[in-house]
């Protein structure tokens, strides 16, 4: 599915992994129900809660041209305690 762009791995999101919360950047037009259904079907997990926010715009200069990068929505997904996403497991 092209609505889920990629997982986000920052210091904060790595701390969230301990609470069984995972962070993804998704398409701005994607709804919570679409993303929830896709996560449950693709990873075979049970989603308990979802939080979303849109990070603020930031200006980007390329030479003399000033513009804005493509907008996205960030989803923080909480799973049931007995589920995990194998993509984020450490070995």
From Swiss-Prot:
GO cellular component: chloroplast; ribonucleoprotein complex; ribosome
Superkingdom of the source species: Eukaryota
MF (Gene Ontology): rRNA binding; structural constituent of ribosome
InterPro entries: Nucleotide-bd_a/b_plait_sf (IPR012677), Ribosomal_uL23-like (IPR013025), Ribosomal_uL23/eL15/eS24_sf (IPR012678), Ribosomal_uL23_CS (IPR001014)
Example GO BP: translation
Compartment(s) of residence: Plastid, Chloroplast
Keyword flag Chloroplast: yes
Record flagged with keyword Acyltransferase: no
UniProt keyword list: Chloroplast, Plastid, Ribonucleoprotein, Ribosomal protein, RNA-binding, rRNA-binding
Subunit text: Part of the 50S ribosomal subunit.
General function of this protein: Binds to 23S rRNA.
Similarity comment: family membership: Belongs to the universal ribosomal protein uL23 family.
Name of the protein: Large ribosomal subunit protein uL23c
């Amino acid at each position: 599915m092209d609505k889920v762009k990629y997982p986000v791995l920052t210091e904060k999101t790595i701390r969230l992994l301990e609470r069984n919360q995972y962070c993804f950047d998704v398409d701005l037009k994607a709804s919570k129900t679409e993303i929830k259904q896709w996560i449950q079907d693709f990873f075979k997990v049970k989603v308990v809660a979802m939080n979303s926010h849109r990070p603020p715009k930031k200006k980007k200069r390329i030479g003399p041209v000033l513009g804005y990068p493509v907008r996205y929505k960030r989803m923080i997904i909480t799973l049931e305690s007995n589920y995990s996403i194998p993509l984020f497991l450490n070995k």
